[in-house]
């Protein structure tokens, strides 16, 4: 889902 993508993005950023 989109929430998962946001979590991964926050990890990278």
Curated annotation (Swiss-Prot):
UniProt entry tagged with the keyword Nucleotidyltransferase: no
GO process terms (BP): defense response to fungus; defense response to Gram-negative bacterium; defense response to Gram-positive bacterium; disruption of plasma membrane integrity in another organism; killing of cells of another organism
Domain of life from the UniProt record: Eukaryota
Subcellular location: Secreted; Target cell membrane
Keywords, in A-Z order: Amidation, Antibiotic, Antimicrobial, Fungicide, Membrane, Secreted, Target cell membrane, Target membrane
GO cellular component: extracellular region; membrane; other organism cell membrane
Modified residues (Leucine amide): 13
Known tissue expression: Expressed by the venom gland.
Keyword tRNA-binding: no
Free-text function comment from the UniProt entry: Antimicrobial peptide with activity against Gram-positive bacteria (B.subtilis, S.aureus and L.monocytogenes) and Gram-negative bacteria (E.coli and P.aeruginosa) (MIC=1.3-35 uM). Also active against fungus C.albicans (MIC=6.3 uM). Has little hemolytic activity. Acts by disrupting membranes and bacterial cell wall structures. Binds to peptidoglycan and lipopolysaccharide (LPS). In the context of inflammation and cancer tests, is weakly cytotoxic to normal cells, induces calcium signaling but does not impact cAMP production.
Family: Belongs to the lasioglossin-like family.
Designated name of the protein: Macropin
Organism of provenance: Macropis fulvipes
Organism taxonomic ancestry: Eukaryota, Metazoa, Ecdysozoa, Arthropoda, Hexapoda
